[in-house]
């Protein structure tokens, strides 16, 4: 038995709704890693991403809902590849705080996220 175990979480070229991811943006590469905590009952406002991003749910669960109402719930230990260019929001419908680490593959000063109505 090895002392090191590698467990793939995600290996895809599609977002969680099955849409193909766009090409990486031109310009100076910029990688951003964020840690977020969403309390039970809290809802992240409707927004859209201009760059590819993916994350791992460390604790709790998060339901992500697209502007068309398509939704998927991600639980602790699962990877999520976010929608790019499509308005969506996240909501913690669980009973404990959700903790997530998100990785963004951007370029230059491109915004990671923008509000959407």
Task: Label each PLM-derived region with a short phrase.
Residues 1-32, 116-117:
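A short, N-terminal "cap"/entry segment at the start of jelly-roll beta-barrel domains
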Residues 38, 68-85:
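Short acidic-glycine-tyrosine-enriched beta hairpin
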Residues 49-68:
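Glycine- and acidic-residue-biased ligand/ion/polar-headgroup-sensing regions
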Residues 33-35, 54, 79-81, 102:
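Conserved hydrophobic/aromatic beta-strand scaffold that supports enzyme active sites
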Residues 84-110:
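Ligand-binding loop in jelly-roll beta-barrel domains
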Residues 43-44, 61-65, 79:
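Short beta-strand segments in beta-sandwich/barrel cores
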Residues 44-51, 86:
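Histidine-centered catalytic micro-motifs
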